Regions:
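Bacterial N-terminal signal peptides that target proteins for export
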Residues: 1-10
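Residue-level signal for mature regions of secreted extracellular proteins and peptides
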Residues: 15, 60-62, 78
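C-terminal motif of bacterial Sec signal peptides marking the signal peptidase cleavage site
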Residues: 18-21
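Bacterial signal peptide processing site
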Residues: 23-25
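Buried hydrophobic packing residues in well-ordered domains
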Residues: 27-29, 35, 153
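Post-signal peptide N-terminal segment of mature Sec-exported envelope proteins
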Residues: 31-47
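Post-signal-peptide N-terminal segment of Sec-exported extracytoplasmic proteins
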Residues: 44-74
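Mature, soluble, non-transmembrane domains
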Residues: 70, 74-199
């Protein structure tokens, strides 16, 4: 699990296109103390696409298809034919970011006793996902795959004190349509953040 959320969106899109389908992705950071948290990534692949992936793999073992292959991930096949991949990592903030995240991972800063600011840059998200250089057929295919699907980024704590995302009870989140990323029309501040109370 990585909190290198925005930097990894390009990878998510590349994987999704490679699977000839689309999914909805929710990435959540639950700040539990001044030094620890829980990161949860939930990816849902629609029934039609998941059926194609399984058929393409030549077996009922979805693990062969590349979807939900990350260490520690749990795959659930839903009654409607869709599939949900859940990955949870809990522990010190340093363990929530990939070792290779470098400057693109989530930043955790204790701003006062019991108050933590979580932030991450949006530059990678805005810079890597345009369709420049692609032919019209490829652009049309990507539009079809990703229409109606989105990535949700959520930060939780005991209380949200300040944020530039949408506040919803004890969480702050932003929902970004994949098409806005692909078309380069997404409007984001230089960084997304939420300041949360943890006690």
């Amino acid at each position: 699990m990585s909190l290198n959320i925005l930097g990894k969106v390009a990878g998510i899109l590349a994987l999704t296109v490679g699977l000839a389908g689309c999914m909805d992705v929710t990435m959540e950071i639950d700040v539990q103390t001044e030094t620890t948290g829980k990161a949860t990534t939930t990816s849902v692949m629609g029934a039609d696409v998941y059926a194609m992936i399984k058929a393409g793999a030549g077996s009922d073992d979805a693990g062969d298809d590349g979807f939900c292959k990350e260490a520690g991930a749990t795959l659930t096949e839903n009654a409607d034919g869709s599939a949900t991949c859940l990955l949870v990592v809990e522990g010190p903030f340093a363990e929530l970011n990939d070792a290779d995240a470098k400057d693109d991972g989530a930043k955790f800063e204790v701003v006062s006793p019991g108050v933590v600011k979580v932030s991450f840059t949006t530059e990678d998200m805005k810079g890597e996902l345009g369709t420049e250089g692609q032919d019209e057929e490829t652009k049309a295919m990507m539009q079809q795959f990703f229409e109606g699907h989105s990535i949700t980024i959520r930060i939780k704590g005991k209380e949200i004190l300040d944020t530039n995302m949408t506040k919803n009870g004890n969480s702050a989140e932003i929902v970004i349509p994949f098409l806005d990323l692909i078309n380069g029309t997404v409007e984001l501040p230089p960084a997304l953040y939420a300041t949360v109370k943890v006690n």
